[in-house]
Amino acid sequence: MTQIINKDEVQETSSKKLTIKTANSIDQAQFELRKITERTSGTVQDEAIKVVDDILKNVRERGDEALTEYTSRFDGFLTEKFQVSSDLILKAWEETPRELQDSLLLAKKRIEKFHSLQVPKNITYTGPNGETLGRRWSPVEKAGIYVPGGRAAYPSTVLMNAIPAYVAGVNQIIMVSPANSQGEINQTVLAAAHITGINKIFRLGGAQAICALASGTESIPKVDVITGPGNIYVTLAKKKVYGKVGIDSLAGPSEILIIADQSAKLEHVASDMLAQSEHDPLASAILITTNTKLAEKLPAEINRQLINHPRLKICQESISNWGLIVLCDDLETCAQLSDTFAPEHLELLVEDPKKLSESINNAGAIFMGPWSPEAIGDYLGGPNHTLPTSGTARFAGALGVETFMKNTSLIDFSKEAFNENKNAVVQLANSEGLHSHAESIRIRDSKSF
């Protein structure tokens, strides 16, 4: 059975049960999951593409002049100086309450430790005829980090993007983030930047910030890789500049899928779903469960926890439009449905989460058991919280140190190795009709050096 939580029902009292929509087959459940995956496609995106195209064209042609105009129009303040001074960044850190400083430092320590384990190793191989082959990793020169503003401040985004770049050995880490109408970036965001090795910070947001990083302007350095989440305009801008620069991913609205059995606690499931829904009206929270009572009681518990919620409207819109409950006969079916959806975040609130996790192939991150809520991973678990969304966990993974690195192949053939392999190369080149490829082998074969 599939239960979709409707907006009007969320606003009713918790004593009234929400209507349950029954799915006649697994196919019906998969259909509902596909609708969630595709929730950002359509007319809105088409209109946004036109806006982004205009912004990219203007920034490329007019540089800082265009940035000034867009900042005034979209962010509400007028400036020709986008860079945040080092004094302001230090001041933000010094004025951060000690307890929050300690929390930021703890998160930094844990994230840095985990990501230091990801640094790829160079490899060297000596072939049978003395040829030396290798693969060498090196960091990009400059990385651009986008930190969103808007509905909330995200110092965790600073940590999760800047620390992997720092660990990778990136020479210059450039951060952009939209300021408020007074031209100020959130103080905790600046405090997080202070401790993560960021070299420069610019008060700049939206598609215009992405274009500035990709192309460079009079004041904004051109970078090699751009990472960080944003709204639909930021995401489309990243899509447009990809190929000119590297990017981490095309992030869609956030999502969580929870698989729960008889051992799951109702209040845990509800709170974890709301923790996802409070991000954004387009965020999605899904429960797939074998527990009939949990499925029946969850709407009322969500309603109860929404009482006096500071982000009530966002949660209601998210849950009502993109919340989903699926009741299954067994955990194997739950896992199969989860793999079909390929969630960004997957929580396993089951009796044996490690065993169930072994049957999961498609998930950005898996949170196992009652003591590993998604919020742990969002802030300081260690693994990165920048994860594939909208079904892309089928082929993509989390942001990591390698996002800010590239590899170079090394080939050093000896004369003996050349002679041993030359005939095969000529045959292969001829089969492709590439005369000069074959000739580059023959000419060496005929010369003595």
Curated annotation (Swiss-Prot):
Give TM segment ranges.
none
Gene Ontology biological-process annotations: L-histidine biosynthetic process
| EC class (word) | oxidoreductase
Which keywords, in A-to-Z order, does the entry hold?
A: Amino-acid biosynthesis, Histidine biosynthesis, Metal-binding, NAD, Oxidoreductase, Zinc
Signal peptide span: none
Alphabetized SUPFAM superfamilies for the sequence: ALDH-like
Known PANTHER family for this protein? HISTIDINE BIOSYNTHESIS TRIFUNCTIONAL PROTEIN, HISTIDINOL DEHYDROGENASE HDH
Q: What is this protein called?
A: Histidinol dehydrogenase
